[in-house]
């Protein structure tokens, strides 16, 4: 018997996985199209600066990395040309942090683990039929190229 999916998400990066988890939380059946993983010869040292809303969303998905992989930024001093400058302070704004610097591999792993344990998400190799398709492939999107949609 063929599987029925409510949505097909093309792209299993951070955005695609987070969207899949959010939709599954709403009881939707999700097909998540993931490209085959290739082993990298170099260590992934990428990091994202994520705001409080992103942290709150990832916390709600139980996908926020541990403290070793998410560093809060408490203060920031920006110096411009000449004598211009501006300072920001999380405590003065009543915020936990101005932003967090998050290791990309740790965040990707937390989201992948959450997807693996979500029964309403099925990771597939190729797009499947669904009433709705979300394109979360990033800049080099093969789907947009198929559709002739420039970015």
For the regions a language model picked out, list residue spans one by one.
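A short alpha->loop->secondary-structure connector
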Residues: 150-151
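Short alpha-helical segment within the catalytic ATP-binding CA
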Residues: 17-18, 53
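Conserved Rossmann-like nucleotide-cofactor binding loop
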Residues: 15, 38, 140
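N-terminal FAD cofactor-binding segment of flavoenzymes
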Residues: 43-80
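Conserved N-terminal helical subregion
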Residues: 2, 71-147
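Residue-level detector of anion-binding/catalytic polar loops
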Residues: 29, 64, 122
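Beta1/beta-strand and adjacent pyrophosphate-binding region of the FAD-binding site
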Residues: 2-15, 31
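Glycine-rich FAD pyrophosphate-binding loop
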Residues: 10, 22-46
């Amino acid at each position: 018997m063929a599987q029925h999916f409510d949505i097909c998400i093309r792209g299993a990066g951070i955005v695609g996985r987070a969207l899949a988890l959010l939709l599954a939380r709403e009881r939707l059946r999700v097909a998540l199209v993931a490209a085959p993983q290739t082993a990298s010869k170099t260590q992934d040292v990428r990091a994202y600066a994520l705001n409080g809303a992103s942290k709150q969303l990832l916390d709600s998905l139980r996908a926020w990395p541990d403290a070793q992989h998410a560093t809060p930024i408490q203060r920031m001093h920006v110096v411009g040309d000449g004598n211009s400058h501006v300072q920001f302070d999380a405590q003065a704004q009543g915020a936990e942090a101005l932003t967090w610097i998050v290791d990309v591999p740790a965040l990707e792993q937390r989201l992948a683990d959450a997807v693996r344990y979500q029964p309403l998400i099925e990771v597939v190799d190729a797009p499947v039929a669904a009433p709705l398709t979300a394109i979360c492939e990033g800049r080099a999107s093969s789907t947009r190229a198929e559709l002739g949609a420039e970015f």
